[in-house]
Protein backbone atom coordinates (compact mmCIF):
# COMPACT_ATOMS: atom_id res chain seq x y z
CA UNK A 1 0.00 0.00 0.00
CA UNK A 2 1.30 3.44 -0.91
CA UNK A 3 0.19 6.40 1.19
CA UNK A 4 -0.13 9.94 -0.17
CA UNK A 5 -0.68 12.30 2.74
CA UNK A 6 -1.03 15.21 0.29
CA UNK A 7 -4.27 13.61 -0.93
CA UNK A 8 -5.73 13.64 2.61
CA UNK A 9 -7.46 16.79 3.87
CA UNK A 10 -6.10 17.83 7.27
CA UNK A 11 -8.30 17.88 10.34
CA UNK A 12 -7.53 20.81 12.63
CA UNK A 13 -7.57 19.66 16.25
CA UNK A 14 -7.47 22.44 18.86
CA UNK A 15 -5.46 21.65 22.01
CA UNK A 16 -4.36 18.18 20.81
CA UNK A 17 -4.20 15.88 23.86
CA UNK A 18 -4.59 18.99 26.03
CA UNK A 19 -1.67 20.83 24.42
CA UNK A 20 -1.36 24.45 23.34
CA UNK A 21 -2.51 25.81 19.98
CA UNK A 22 -3.64 23.33 17.36
CA UNK A 23 -2.54 20.29 15.37
CA UNK A 24 -3.20 19.63 11.68
CA UNK A 25 -3.71 15.87 11.37
CA UNK A 26 -3.78 13.87 8.13
CA UNK A 27 -4.77 10.27 8.83
CA UNK A 28 -4.01 7.97 5.89
CA UNK A 29 -4.70 4.65 7.63
CA UNK A 30 -7.10 3.87 10.48
CA UNK A 31 -8.07 0.26 9.87
CA UNK A 32 -8.61 -1.21 13.33
CA UNK A 33 -5.07 -2.60 13.30
CA UNK A 34 -3.46 0.79 13.83
CA UNK A 35 -3.11 4.32 12.50
CA UNK A 36 -0.61 6.09 10.26
CA UNK A 37 -0.77 9.87 10.19
CA UNK A 38 1.12 13.09 9.77
CA UNK A 39 0.78 15.79 12.34
CA UNK A 40 1.81 19.40 11.79
CA UNK A 41 2.22 21.59 14.86
CA UNK A 42 2.43 25.31 14.07
CA UNK A 43 5.01 27.31 16.03
CA UNK A 44 3.89 27.66 19.64
CA UNK A 45 1.69 24.55 19.53
CA UNK A 46 2.15 21.31 21.45
CA UNK A 47 0.85 17.81 22.04
CA UNK A 48 -0.17 17.54 25.70
CA UNK A 49 1.23 14.89 28.01
CA UNK A 50 -0.64 11.61 27.60
CA UNK A 51 -0.15 7.92 28.37
CA UNK A 52 -0.43 5.25 25.69
CA UNK A 53 -2.92 2.55 26.64
CA UNK A 54 -3.68 -0.21 24.14
CA UNK A 55 -0.97 0.90 21.73
CA UNK A 56 2.52 2.26 21.38
CA UNK A 57 3.61 5.14 19.15
CA UNK A 58 6.50 5.71 16.79
CA UNK A 59 7.08 9.35 15.81
CA UNK A 60 9.52 10.38 13.09
CA UNK A 61 10.38 14.08 12.74
CA UNK A 62 10.03 15.13 9.10
CA UNK A 63 10.88 18.82 9.61
CA UNK A 64 11.13 21.49 12.26
CA UNK A 65 12.32 21.14 15.82
CA UNK A 66 10.81 20.59 19.22
CA UNK A 67 11.24 18.95 22.57
CA UNK A 68 9.74 15.62 23.65
CA UNK A 69 8.71 15.18 27.28
CA UNK A 70 9.45 11.45 27.50
CA UNK A 71 8.52 9.87 30.85
CA UNK A 72 9.73 12.99 32.67
CA UNK A 73 12.84 13.60 30.58
CA UNK A 74 13.10 16.46 28.06
CA UNK A 75 14.70 15.33 24.80
CA UNK A 76 15.35 17.71 21.87
CA UNK A 77 13.79 16.67 18.54
CA UNK A 78 15.11 17.65 15.10
CA UNK A 79 14.42 16.48 11.55
CA UNK A 80 15.50 12.90 10.99
CA UNK A 81 15.05 11.79 14.62
CA UNK A 82 12.62 9.09 15.72
CA UNK A 83 10.90 8.84 19.11
CA UNK A 84 9.32 5.63 20.45
CA UNK A 85 6.71 5.64 23.22
CA UNK A 86 5.96 2.08 24.43
CA UNK A 87 2.52 1.08 25.69
CA UNK A 88 1.98 2.32 29.24
CA UNK A 89 4.46 5.20 28.91
CA UNK A 90 3.81 8.95 28.86
CA UNK A 91 4.96 11.62 26.43
CA UNK A 92 4.13 15.05 24.99
CA UNK A 93 5.81 17.29 22.40
CA UNK A 94 6.34 21.06 22.19
CA UNK A 95 7.45 22.99 19.12
CA UNK A 96 10.56 25.15 19.43
CA UNK A 97 11.60 27.84 17.00
CA UNK A 98 9.53 29.69 14.43
CA UNK A 99 8.84 26.86 11.94
CA UNK A 100 6.10 24.23 12.19
CA UNK A 101 7.06 20.81 13.53
CA UNK A 102 5.98 18.07 11.09
CA UNK A 103 5.75 14.51 12.39
CA UNK A 104 4.95 11.07 10.97
CA UNK A 105 3.08 9.01 13.55
CA UNK A 106 2.61 5.24 13.51
CA UNK A 107 0.35 3.74 16.16
CA UNK A 108 -0.05 -0.05 15.91
CA UNK A 109 -2.79 -1.45 18.15
CA UNK A 110 -1.54 -3.87 20.82
CA UNK A 111 -4.57 -6.16 20.52
Predicted segment positions?
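Conserved short histidine dyad/triad with adjacent acidic residue
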Residues: 37-52
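Short, surface-exposed secondary-structure edge patches
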Residues: 38, 58, 73-75
Amino acid sequence: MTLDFNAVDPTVVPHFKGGAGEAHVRTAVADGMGRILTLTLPAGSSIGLHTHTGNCEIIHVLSGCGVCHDDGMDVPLTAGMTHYCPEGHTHGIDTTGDAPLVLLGILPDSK
